[in-house]
Structure formats: C-alpha cells, structure tokens
C-alpha cells in the first residue's frame, strides 16, 4: 500500500474512533495513540526516511497535512466536550424553583444604633438641627478652644489617643461646638451624635470607644431653667415615663456652672441594683457654656448665652434596658443582640 493510501485509511479510521469519544480522558488517549511518541504517525516518519530522495518532499507534505487534519479534529472535539461538560455541570447546579425556600434570619438595628436614633429623633422634635464633626480632631478644637488648661489631665496620653503631637481621636462630641459657633451668628441649636475615643481600661462600665450625643443651644437670654426644662422633656420621652430630675454641681472646663444630671429610677426610690439603691440614675453632664468658649468661637458672651449637654448612648441603653456590662455591645453575641431586634 502506498503511503498516500495509508494516510487516507488512517484519517478514516481516526474519524471512526473519534465519533466514539465522549470524554476528555478518552480524547487524550486517542491523541496519544495517533500522535504520541510511540503513536501511529511514528511509522510514517520511519517510512519517510526509507522513501527515495525525489519523493521525500511530497511524502513529507502529505504526512504533515494528515497530521494537521487530525490535530484540528482533536481541537474541535475537545472544545465540544468541554462545552458539553460545562452544560452538564450547569444543569446539576440549576436551582429548582419548585423546592420550598430556606428561612432567612432577618437583620435588625444594633441596640446602640436604635438608642442613638431614638435620642437624635427626640432632640430633632425639640427643635435641634443634626450636625457632625470629625472623629480625628486637632488638639486645639478638642481641648484648647473648649477651655481645657494646658496641664489638664484629659490632655495626657494615658487618657487620650494622640495620632501626632497636635492631632487626637476626639474624646467627646463637644468638638462640634466650636465648629458650629464659628460659622455664624446665633441662634444655634444643634445636636451632634458620634463616636468618641478614650485611652481607658476596658471593663464592665467603660470602653475605649463609645457613642455620645452633644446638644447645645446658644441665643439671647438662654438660662439654666431652659436647660432643665429641655432635659425634663427629653428624659420623660426617652424613658417613656414620668421622671424627676436632679442636678448636682460638677466641674467641666467648657461649662460654668457645670452639673451632673440624674433622673429618678423606676424603682421609685425603693432601691434596686440598677440605681445601686440610691433611687437615682446618673445620665449626663451638662451646664451653661463657659463665656471663654463663646469668645473662642467668635461669640460675644455679653450678648449671648447657651447651654450644653453630653450623654453616652451606651449608658442610656444600659439604663433603659437593664444591661449590666458595656462590653456586650461589642461582642456580636446573637443571644444578646436578638433580644432587642
């Protein structure tokens, strides 16, 4: 048999065998059998060496053409097999829409977020505008312009996170006061929610990061009575019950006079673990804005006065819901969080 006839017979036999191939493995085996180092085309290479010199070029071209033909068929078959395998895999993964669905647990607001939103909503209802200030603040805005002395303990690194010599993570949301008062003439009535950071030991009652709301009002003839009236209305709404307010003198650099704000406990002075058997719950620090803070902000304290109050959101959540450990808010324990969802 002439080489040309053998090549044609090889092509026909290959096509017959190729039609029986339906997997990548079988196709690989067929390719090795024909084109491998010990495959059928090896014998054509041997015959080419024995061929007369004047016929070698023609025979070589015929062998290469046959080999290319088989390689093209193998490539096309491989593509077809891959497509079929992908389609089969896709069908396996197809979703049966007739199957019953799996129940999904709906998400909900974190208890701290819920309380924060409630607090802000109450202040907005009382006529305050919502403003924000940055978490990263200059030492000047966080301390100096709020009347903190140079040697005040709060400025020390063991109480405050310093990013550099003049930049801190804010220790309170009071930094909004200077920013807002510097923008224009009173009246200004602002509530500012946000995160605060303090370099403290983490315990059941304190954390290095917490939420705070600052509310302040500056206008002509604002008095301590206005502050008391606002606080009474706020806490009555927040705790959803009638409350008594108790103001205790305290010291804060940015207010004068400064006061600690207590509200009557739900135990009605009978004494309980929540109020530590005192009948009162400490809820905020407040006071009349210090004249020097007004001056630092470009406001004339002879013409305008104002009050300010700052309250920790985690503390309010703990008091309202009887939570004993502030660390629970950060632990992502669903057994705890789902009680408030």
Curated annotation (Swiss-Prot):
Natural source organism: Chlamydia caviae (strain ATCC VR-813 / DSM 19441 / 03DC25 / GPIC)
Cofactor dependency: Mg(2+)
Protein name per UniProt: Phenylalanine--tRNA ligase alpha subunit
Entry-linked InterPro entries: aa-tRNA-synth_II (IPR006195), aa-tRNA-synth_II/BPL/LPL (IPR045864), Phe-tRNA-synth_IIc_asu (IPR004529), Phe-tRNA_ligase_II_N (IPR004188), Phe_tRNA_ligase_alpha1_bac (IPR022911), Phenylalanyl-tRNA_Synthase (IPR002319), tRNA-bd_arm (IPR010978)
Cofactor: how bound: Binds 2 magnesium ions per tetramer.
EC numbers for this chain: 6.1.1.20
Family matches, as SUPFAM superfamilies: Class II aaRS and biotin synthetases, tRNA-binding arm
Name of one Pfam family that matches: tRNA-synt_2d
Molecular function (Gene Ontology), one example: magnesium ion binding
Subcellular location field: Cytoplasm
Family in the record: Belongs to the class-II aminoacyl-tRNA synthetase family. Phe-tRNA synthetase alpha subunit type 1 subfamily.
Alphabetical keyword list: Aminoacyl-tRNA synthetase, ATP-binding, Cytoplasm, Ligase, Magnesium, Metal-binding, Nucleotide-binding, Protein biosynthesis
Chief localization: cytoplasm
UniProt binding sites for Mg(2+): 256
GO-annotated cellular components: cytoplasm
Subunit structure: Tetramer of two alpha and two beta subunits.
Catalytic activity field: tRNA(Phe) + L-phenylalanine + ATP = L-phenylalanyl-tRNA(Phe) + AMP + diphosphate + H(+)
């Amino acid at each position: 048999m002439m080489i040309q006839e053998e090549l044609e017979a090889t092509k026909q036999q290959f096509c017959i065998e190729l039609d029986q191939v339906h997997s990548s493995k079988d196709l690989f085996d067929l390719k090795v059998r024909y084109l491998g180092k010990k495959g059928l085309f090896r014998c054509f290479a041997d015959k080419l060496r024995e061929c007369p010199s004047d016929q070698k070029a023609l025979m070589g071209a015929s062998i290469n053409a046959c080999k290319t033909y088989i390689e093209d068929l193998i490539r096309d078959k491989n593509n077809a097999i891959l497509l079929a395998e992908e389609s089969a895999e896709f069908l396996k993964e197809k979703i049966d829409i007739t199957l019953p669905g799996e129940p999904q647990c709906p998400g909900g607001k974190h208890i701290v977020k819920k309380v924060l939103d409630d607090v802000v909503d109450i202040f907005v209802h009382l006529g305050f505008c919502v403003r924000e200030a940055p978490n990263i603040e200059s030492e000047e805005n966080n301390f100096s312009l709020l009347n903190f002395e140079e040697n005040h303990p709060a400025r020390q690194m063991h109480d405050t996170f310093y990013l550099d010599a003049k930049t801190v993570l804010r220790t309170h949301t009071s930094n909004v006061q200077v920013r807002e008062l510097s923008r224009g003439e009173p009246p200004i009535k602002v509530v500012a929610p946000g995160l605060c950071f303090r370099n403290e030991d983490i315990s059941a009652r304190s954390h290095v990061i917490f939420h705070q709301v600052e509310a302040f009002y500056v206008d002509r003839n604002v008095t301590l009575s206005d502050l008391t009236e606002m606080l009474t209305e706020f806490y009555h709404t927040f705790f959803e019950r009638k409350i008594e307010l108790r103001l205790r003198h305290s010291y804060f650099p940015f207010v004068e006079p400064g006061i600690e704000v207590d509200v009557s406990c739900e135990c009605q002075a009978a004494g309980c673990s929540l109020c530590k058997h005192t009948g009162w719950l400490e809820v905020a620090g407040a006071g009349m804005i210090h004249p020097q803070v007004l001056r630092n902000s470009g406001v004339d304290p002879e013409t305008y006065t104002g009050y300010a109050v700052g309250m920790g959101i985690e503390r309010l959540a703990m008091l309202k819901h009887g939570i004993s450990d502030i660390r629970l808010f950060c632990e992502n324990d669903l057994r705890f969080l789902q009680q408030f969802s």
